[in-house]
Amino acid sequence: MNTHVSDITQLTIDNWGVTAQTGILTDVLLGKPDHFRWVPLNSISAVNQANEEQMGYRFDKQKAMRQHRQMVEAYEANGVRVHYVEADEGLPSSVFTRDSSFMTPWGAVITSIQTPPRRRDYAVASEFYRNAGIPIWKWVTAGHFEGGDFVIVKPRVALMGWSGDRSTKDGAEQVEGWLREKGWDTFVVPIPPQFVHMDAVVVMLEENLALVCEDALPSYAIDWFDKQGIERIVVPYADCVKLGGNVVSLGGKRVLSMSHNVNVNRTLKERGFEVTAIDYEMFALGGGGVHCSCHELRRLVPG
């Protein structure tokens, strides 16, 4: 059953917080797709939309609504409670909740999105946290930093990316400073703008295991993963730019993916993962995958 804001207010703050992006996912924040439509958000969506006529792409609102509902049902079938930011007709891309905030052990961080159609997504994100009784720990004020560029690699170790087109170096460094004040180890690395966010390049699957597009990272970043003891399942460049690595770890060797990720899904199954793959074409063509479309509010601590 879906959990709405009126239900969330009955929960205590002790129920919230994320110390790792692995472990059993219990609560997830999604956007409502009521006003979703295609707008040029990034290089992926801009190219897709520029090729609509030649490639036969066509936005289908009812299909998008069905696909989003399928995602909700997949979460619920895996025991995840679903929460929502409210739909707003002026914010057609707020369905991609990964970017407007991210959760920490101390509360939420409200981000600063650079893309003009999304600059006010912070309004519905911050409203959700206020209504839910979840503290807002920080607001990004230096440059821009978006939640898709924040990866907790392991407890107290965070990876942050910036492309310049979306997150900026000064925004990433502001977040880095907050975490270092809390005693965390941090690593900031630039990524090519065609990948948009770090979560198109690196997604944690299980403790010390990640999907990684090594072609998108400098060699010193690969060395950093080695030093952290992170095993990597490599996603080829061609799959990565189609959001092939943009999956959601549900914990317990379970993954939510998209059906067009044929190669990645096959590899994950060969590695013993239970893969729930949904058709998410309307949103992927619009610039975001299933990982872009969610934000974890609570995970059980690994181990």
Feature annotation, model-predicted:
Residues 1-303:
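The feature marks the mature, well-folded catalytic cores of soluble enzymes
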